Amino acid sequence: MQTISARVIKKSRKHETLVKRYGAFLAEAKFSAGTNVHPRDLVARRAGDDWLIEAKVIRRGNVSHAVREAIGQLATYAFLLYPADSQPRRMALFTEAIGDVYVRLLSHQGIASVWPTEDGWAGSPEAVNAGLAQKEA
């Protein structure tokens, strides 16, 4: 068993707002969702699927940095917090659209992706198929 040390992490209001808003969407979509599961941002469960969700704020248009951080954090948390024989499905949540190349990169890593739109949530095909987003990008 690995222990992750407690530390103070500064999170922006954008991050907190994104997590809260998406958590509300998950509840409406009949997921059991948790938003207070430190160090994870969100966890969700529906129909026997457990999802580990990492939320990322895209700062100054730097999608690449946010995507790389999401990949690293999802891999780390899945490894440290879940048994090897009971790994969660993984999803990255962003404050804005990330573009086709990054959607495909995340999919290649087995990670679904989602971001807000004016009228709901868009995402990768995996996210839409799982009910984590309303429409494909």
Regions found by a protein language model. Name each.
Residues 28-50, 107-108, 125:
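An acidic intrinsically disordered interaction segment
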Residues 65, 112-137:
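Non-catalytic C-terminal interaction segments of nucleic acid-processing enzymes
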Residues 1-34:
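Acidic-basic catalytic patches of nuclease active cores, encompassing PD-(D/E)XK
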Residues 22, 42-44, 49-60:
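Conserved catalytic cores of phosphodiester-cleaving nucleases, focusing on short active-site segments
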Residues 60-71:
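Active-site-adjacent loop/helix micro-motif of nuclease/hydrolase catalytic cores
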Residues 73-79:
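Short, well-ordered amphipathic alpha-helices
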Residues 79-118:
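Nucleic-acid nuclease catalytic cores
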